[in-house]
Design a protein with these regions (language model features):
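Active-site-proximal or metal-binding-adjacent scaffold patches in catalytic folds
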Residues: 1-28, 37-68
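Walker B catalytic acidic pair
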Residues: 33
Length: 68
């Protein structure tokens, strides 16, 4: 499922179903999309940045995937 997207100009779009998720899952999606403003891919650098801004991102990603 696609939870969010971010345009090159910085516009975020979030899946309306996300409102039912725990706030930390929402935070994960928003931070994930904002990291795409710096790295437009899912490479090593992208995940390093995501880990800096949200060290426990894997926990929230897994919870969202499991319960989303």
């Amino acid at each position: 499922r696609r939870w969010g997207s971010c345009t090159a100009s910085g516009t975020l779009a979030l899946n309306p179903d996300l409102i039912q998720a725990p706030v930390m899952c929402i935070r994960y999606v928003v931070l994930h999309e904002l990291c795409h403003l710096v790295h437009h891919h899912h490479g090593k650098e992208f995940f390093a940045l995501l880990g800096q801004v949200m060290p426990d991102w894997r926990r929230w990603k897994e919870r969202l995937e499991k319960n989303g």
